[in-house]
Amino acid sequence: MVGIPGPYQFTGDKRVPAMPGSPMEVKIHSRSSPPIMAPLPPVNPGGLRPVGFPPSSHSNGINHSPPTLNGAPSPPQRSSNGPSSSSSSSLANQQLPATCGVRQLSKLKRFLTTLQQFGNDISPEIGEKVRTLVLALVNSTVTIEEFHCKLQEATNFPLRPFVIPFLKANLPLLQRELLHCARAGKQTPSQYLAQHEHILLNTSTSSPADSSELLMEMNGNGKRHSPDRREEERETAPAEPPVKRVCTISPAPRHSPALSLPLVNSTSHFHPTPPPLQHYSLEDIPSSQLYRDHLNKIGEHRDVRDRHHSSGVNGNLNNGYQEELVDHRLTEREWAEEWKHLDHALNCIMEMVEKTRRSMAVLRRCQEVDRDELNYWKRRFNESNEIRKGSEHPSRQHSPSSTDSGASDSVRDFGSRTGAGYVTDEIWRKAEEAVNEVKRQAMSEVQKAVSEAEQKAFEMIASERARMEQTIVDAKRRAAEDAVLVVNEQEESTESCWNCGRKASETCSGCNIARYCGSFCQHKDWEKHHRICGQSMHTQAKPLTPSRSLIPKASDPVLLSPTLERSSSATSRSSTPASVTAVDGL
């Protein structure tokens, strides 16, 4: 067959080919030369007809990379990052089978529906932003890269690496279908999409995929998810690839010997070992197509198994290739993470159980305390009732018959209470009444004690105030008496100084009575002495002669004239007391 090597020609069975780069059922084909090669042509239902595309069809800078195993998408490698609508022009001329287009469109619609539902789960505003981004992506107003960046900014969740190649491979199909429907309705694609938005984002026909298969486990700032979302995402392994894993597409020198062993598919049929890929190199495969993500491989293996059962081939190999089965065993790191989460959950449960046990113990103790307190107040109430009854009927205390009757009444009352007809509400009511009565008595006693204490305090304050006033009056009286006594002592003492008590050497010139040791003590004592100075003079005095001394003696009575009194008072107001001059009676 032309264009396909002999060992890898198709058999006569009808097989629907996959479009290049789609994540549906794809087989690995070896190429005879490493240069650019067009994708496989569609199969003619009437028979196989070799069709080859000339190399000029790839002059737009698009090189189709080889398809990967496990149904993973293989996006084209672009030399320029243009919008996604540029791929629709190259695919518009290719006629694809109806089943291929329907399957790819269904996957793409389910993917877009999942994105919108994920945004709605976060918040209605984010859901509206995601819906706007999806419509803009389908209308080719934004590129796939811009859609990826804006979606990550809106939801704070990055998409998985296989999403961008998947969109680049399958978005042109959806855009071509939208263009065809818009032309049939004589509308523009944007108008048709605005009117038939429910067809694109319809969730009733097929269940959308899990958002954890499309989004990373950690958000942009590295925070953990909420617990409810974490439970949904924990059913799969972390996003980090295992350390030791056979690459899905590897060059010939790195072909693992483990692939030479026959593998068993889900229908227990053995398949021959596929030959190594001799014409591929790591430079031909973009980094986003390696798909080392464990979650992606599990989802791809599930799709491969479903397609294998639906195809009904049951081990019939058309091209001698088989799809590699994915190892579902967890790595040591994944097991450690799972055990750590399990241990944390068990610790949380144990803490909750311990807290519940402590709370129950506290409640039990509180109930016991309340029961004891209730019994105590019941006893107090019964005692108060007995005392009240005893005070109301004092005559019964003197007669034994009345005492016996009272005891029998109390016993009868207690028996009626403990009988089957005793109501619990009545017990609580009486207990509350007893408690209230005791509280009222206690409050009255407290108020009485407070009033008595206040009265005593007022009496003590009044008595202390009276005692203090009496003490002040007594102190003033004693001070006055002491002053008079000092003055009297000074008057009686003629040889001692009236100020300091030492031996006196001078006499006051005003009264000729006060004695001082010097002028300093006379000045110091003048404030007290000037009130009585001159008042103790004798009423009769002998007339003074000119030859007589200016200072009269204390034994000679002198009768001072008014002029002498004025001069003595003027002399007493001066700084230094002076001698009194004799004035004639003339």
UniProtKB/Swiss-Prot annotation:
Coiled coil: 429-481
Domain of life: Eukaryota
Compositional bias per record (Polar residues), positions renumbered to this chain: 56-68
Gene Ontology CC: one annotated term: nucleus
Molecular function (Gene Ontology), one example: zinc ion binding
GO biological process, one term: negative regulation of neuron projection development
Keywords: Coiled coil, Metal-binding, Nucleus, Repressor, Transcription, Transcription regulation, Zinc, Zinc-finger
MYND-type zinc finger locations on the chain: 497-533
InterPro entries per record: CBFA2T1/2/3, MTGR1, NHR2, TAFH/NHR1_dom_sf, TAFH_NHR1, Znf_MYND
Positions bound to Zn(2+) 1: C497, C500, C517, C521
Positions of the UniProt region annotated as Disordered: 1-95, 204-242, 387-417, 561-586
Location(s), subcellular: Nucleus
Domain TAFH: start-end pairs: 102-197
Binding site for Zn(2+) 2: C508, C511, H529, C533
SUPFAM superfamilies, A to Z: HIT/MYND zinc finger-like (SSF144232), TAFH domain-like (SSF158553)
Comp. bias regions, Basic and acidic residues: 228-237
Transmembrane segments: none
Residue spans of biased composition, Low complexity class: 77-90, 399-409, 566-586
Function text: May act as a transcriptional corepressor.
Protein name: Protein CBFA2T2
Organism listed in the record: Xenopus laevis
Chain's gene name: cbfa2t2
